[in-house]
């Protein structure tokens, strides 16, 4: 006995993530189902792409972050707040990559109050900087769903009818402290066509279920960090637009970036309109994007002109939104033993070892599950189909 190497007994070990130790055999014993749930969620998201459906391409989204004392719990590492802010940094980057003509804002609720961390804006750098600074935020008190939703609604209700109005709530607490009847507010949100979705970090809460159901949103409770990221990814694609939403042509301007040098005699320094309501000190600059209608200057696109209201974008912004309207068809799932072709993934060239493979119905090339998800979530086009297109003559 003395010669046995020292090792921690099961009853001496920590209780961290004990649910992942469970296994299930063919007789029906217990098993860790986390990976299976994540796998099914990935595949479900591939099949959920809305083809031939009106989508809210111009999105206005407020993210409400719970800042109550429950965010200091350490079931997510290092704690719920830090994990949430890190995942939101990823979410903001991906959101603007897939929705370049949309805007986002962040609200924090704690101590029965709500305050804006960032205003609605199309500038991802500003949001990411604010999220990095919020890591040092003190979590205390209870959240207030009522105050948070009221604050978001005050801005969203003035958005044009052809845009999507959304709120995503990251809810850690099991309680909410509200100054009035929240069910009356839910009716107001529904009338204003504001879609509210909730991601719970603790357990299902009745008021969140009603809130999501009545406004047409979704409500999920996370299993672990990976599932948390999957649920956030679910909100990157634009939701289907309601049949009652306005359908009209939208005037847009496509300003070119003008660069002037100090040696240019005709160059006139000017202020950027984007600095009017910002915290940064306005400064005189020579170059920028000039609105083709009123000549107001802006530092970056996309933006809505503060003078004439014209939406200013660039052509690549519209091109990157195009894939949502015509999504790539889902690949066919086939058991590996029934597949007679080469046992290598066409995307990563790795050996196919999973129980199922995924075949493109057009080019008949086979992919592993990771490449399948990557193709549908990021590339939005099949590599095999692209390679089969003949090159133009003379190239």
UniProtKB/Swiss-Prot annotation:
UniProt keyword GTP-binding, yes or no: no
InterPro entries: C1-like_sf, Ssl1-like, TFIIH_C1-like_dom, TFIIH_SSL1/p44, VWF_A, vWFA_dom_sf, Znf_C2H2_type, Znf_RING/FYVE/PHD
SMART domains reported in the protein's UniProt record: C1_4, VWA
S-S pairs: none
Top-level taxon: Eukaryota
C4-type ZnF: 291-308
Residues that bear Phosphotyrosine: 95
VWFA domain location: 60-236
Gene Ontology biological process terms in this record: DNA-templated transcription; nucleotide-excision repair; regulation of transcription by RNA polymerase II
Family: Belongs to the GTF2H2 family.
Protein name as annotated: General transcription factor IIH subunit 2-like protein
Organism: Homo sapiens (Human)
Name of the gene encoding the protein in the UniProt record: GTF2H2C
């Amino acid at each position: 006995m003395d010669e046995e190497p020292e090792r921690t007994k099961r009853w001496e070990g920590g209780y961290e993530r004990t649910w992942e130790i469970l296994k299930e055999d063919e007789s029906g014993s217990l098993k860790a189902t986390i990976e299976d749930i994540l796998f099914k969620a990935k595949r479900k998201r591939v099949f959920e792409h809305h083809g031939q459906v009106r989508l809210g391409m111009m999105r206005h989204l407020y993210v409400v972050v719970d800042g109550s004392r429950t965010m200091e719990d350490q079931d997510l590492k290092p704690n719920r707040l830090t994990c949430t802010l890190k995942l939101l940094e990823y979410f903001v980057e991906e959101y603007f990559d897939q929705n370049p003509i949309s805007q986002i804002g962040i609200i924090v609720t704690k101590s029965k109050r709500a305050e804006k961390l960032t205003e609605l804006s199309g500038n991802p750098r500003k949001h990411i900087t604010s999220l990095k600074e919020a890591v040092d935020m003190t979590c205390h008190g209870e959240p207030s769903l009522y105050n948070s939703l009221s604050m978001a609604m005050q801005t969203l209700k003035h958005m044009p009818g052809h845009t999507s109005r959304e709120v995503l709530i990251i809810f850690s607490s099991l309680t909410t402290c509200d100054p009035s009847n929240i069910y009356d507010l839910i009716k107001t949100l529904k009338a204003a066509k504001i879609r509210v979705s909730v991601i719970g970090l603790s357990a299902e809460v009745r008021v969140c279920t009603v809130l999501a159901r009545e406004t047409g949103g979704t409500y999920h409770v996370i299993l672990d960090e990976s599932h948390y990221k999957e649920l956030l990814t679910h909100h990157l694609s634009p939701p289907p637009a309601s049949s009652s939403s306005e359908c009209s042509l939208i005037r847009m301007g496509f300003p070119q970036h003008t660069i002037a040098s100090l040696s240019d005699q005709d160059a006139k320094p000017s202020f950027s309109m984007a600095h009017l309501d910002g915290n940064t000190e306005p400064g005189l600059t020579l170059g920028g994007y000039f609105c083709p209608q009123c000549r107001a200057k802006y530092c970056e696109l996309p933006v809505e002109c503060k003078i004439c209201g014209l939406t200013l974008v660039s052509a690549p912004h519209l091109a990157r939104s195009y894939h949502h309207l015509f999504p790539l068809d889902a690949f066919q799932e086939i058991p590996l033993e029934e597949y007679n072709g080469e046992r290598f993934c066409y995307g990563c060239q790795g050996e196919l070892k999973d129980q199922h493979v995924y075949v493109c119905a057009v080019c008949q090339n086979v992919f592993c599950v990771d490449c399948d998800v990557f193709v549908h979530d990021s590339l939005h086009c099949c590599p095999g189909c692209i390679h089969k297109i003949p090159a133009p003559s003379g190239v």
